[in-house]
């Protein structure tokens, strides 16, 4: 399970709360600026992948400043995260060979 959150630029430091929380920090937590994902604006996006309890905890930690994305917007941003990961893996393969 995953959830994507959007944090306005003035709330970007709240992403650190996820990395400091015992439960959430044990999951996959990826933080990216909007521009690095090819999305306009100065927002910061956070992808949390893991167990349901950790996703719920992340939602609770970010409720005062972050917005959990839903529907096509969440899917679009999630795809941007995955595309970056795939590009990185592809680049490593070109460096080290098959």
Please describe what each predicted stretch is.
Residues 8-12, 49-56:
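Helix N-cap motif at beta-to-alpha junctions
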Residues 28-32, 64-83:
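Conserved short beta-strand edge segments in small beta-sheet-based binding/regulatory domains
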Residues 3-14, 68-72:
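Long, compositionally biased, intrinsically disordered regions
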Residues 1, 29-41:
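Short, flexible, solvent-exposed loop/turn segments with mixed acidic/basic and small polar residues
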Residues 1-2, 13-17, 81-88:
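Long, non-globular segments of proteins
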Residues 7-34:
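Short amphipathic alpha-helix segments
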Residues 78-98:
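Short, low-order "capping/linker" segments at domain edges
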Residues 16-23, 56-67:
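Short amphipathic alpha-helices in soluble, non-transmembrane regions
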């Amino acid at each position: 399970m995953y959830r994507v959150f959007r944090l306005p630029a003035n709330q970007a430091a709240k992403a650190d709360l996820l990395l400091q929380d015992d439960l959430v920090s044990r999951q996959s937590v990826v933080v990216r600026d909007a521009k690095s994902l090819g999305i306009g604006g100065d927002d910061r996006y956070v992808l949390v992948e893991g167990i349901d309890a950790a996703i719920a905890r992340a939602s609770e930690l970010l409720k005062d400043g972050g917005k959990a994305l839903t529907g096509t917007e969440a899917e679009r941003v999630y795809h941007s995260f995955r595309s970056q990961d795939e590009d990185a893996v592809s680049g490593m393969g070109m460096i080290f060979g098959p």
